[in-house]
Regions:
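Short amphipathic alpha-helical segments
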Residues: 14, 88-89, 146-147
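Conserved P-loop NTPase nucleotide-binding/switch module
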Residues: 77-107, 150-154
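Catalytic-core regions built around general acid/base machinery
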Residues: 113-129
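NTP-binding/hydrolysis catalytic cores, primarily Walker-type P-loop NTPases
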Residues: 215-249
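A short acidic, glycine-rich active-site loop
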Residues: 99-116, 173-176
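Loop/turn-to-beta-strand initiation segments
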Residues: 71-74, 127-134
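Conserved P-loop
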Residues: 1-76, 81-86
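Phosphate-binding/switch region of NTP-binding enzymes
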Residues: 130-228
Length: 249
């Protein structure tokens, strides 16, 4: 049972009889495009209260009372990247001094809410015996080396810019703003990455379950050193199934 925040599952027209989808219908903003443009240019927060994060929270609370959710063995959230877009706008609106962009204090609220809501979601799934799948988009992340210096200086417009002097490590991280990007994967037992290989001129999707030097992927499933699989949990978890059956037998 998926909470579809990206609103792409149903539009794909896939015939998935074993999958139920609950779509988040709320837009990122309740303001008109003209109002939002003016507010963004003037560095002002949203005029009307965004509804997306509040609706998502209500949907999560409703899961144990929702028939199709309780009949499913797995709950899914697709995706955390779009979810934080809703949360960010809610924070800006609720801040009495809010502007069009997050302040350092707002980033603290963003981190705290993502930490707490993720932990609550995981606990809720465990309490009801459900597996949990959370998807997130990726972005390139630059991490300063141990001897890299950070210099903050103002540009011609008076805005503070950060300049890094030294080596930078290129990583692929969850596409989440702020510090939670580096913490998100630590909340989950397994962390997989989807990628595409070109085979005979055709795209073939693969699922990587082991680190590749840039992504902090991992699995506790016995995979005998195999790093890439078809994007099918039945293939990845064969070793886990065999081990479990052996222990029970």
């Amino acid at each position: 049972h998926f909470i579809d925040i990206d609103r792409k599952v149903l539009s794909c027209g896939l015939n998935l009889p074993d999958v139920t989808v609950w779509e988040l219908a709320e837009a990122l903003t309740e303001d008109s495009m003209a109002e939002r443009l003016r507010a963004l240019v003037d560095n002002k927060k949203p005029k009307s209260a965004p509804q997306g994060w509040s609706k998502y929270s209500a949907m999560v609370d409703e899961l144990p009372r929702r028939k199709e959710a309780m009949e499913a063995g797995t709950w899914g959230i697709d995706s955390y990247t779009r979810l934080q877009d809703h949360l960010k706008r809610q924070i800006l609106y609720l801040d009495a001094k809010g502007a069009s962009n997050l302040s350092p204090r707002n980033y603290g609220a963003l981190l705290g809410m993502l930490e707490e809501s993720t932990a609550q979601l995981i606990d809720l799934a465990k309490a009801h015996g459900k597996d949990l799948i959370v998807t997130v988009h990726e972005r390139v992340s630059e991490i300063p080396g141990p001897n890299t210096r950070v210099i903050n200086q103002r540009n011609a417009q008076g805005e503070v810019e950060r300049e890094f002097i030294g080596e930078m490590q290129i990583r692929i991280a969850p596409s989440i703003e702020g510090q939670f990007s580096g913490k998100m994967l630590s909340y989950f037992d397994e962390a997989y990455g989807l990628h595409v290989d070109m085979v005979d001129g055709k795209p073939v999707w693969r699922c990587r379950v082991m680190p590749d030097g840039r992504r902090d992927l991992r699995t506790a499933i016995p995979v005998n050193g195999v790093a890439d699989f078809p994007p099918d949990f039945r293939e990845i978890w064969k070793g886990h199934t065999t081990t479990t059956q052996t222990k029970k037998g």
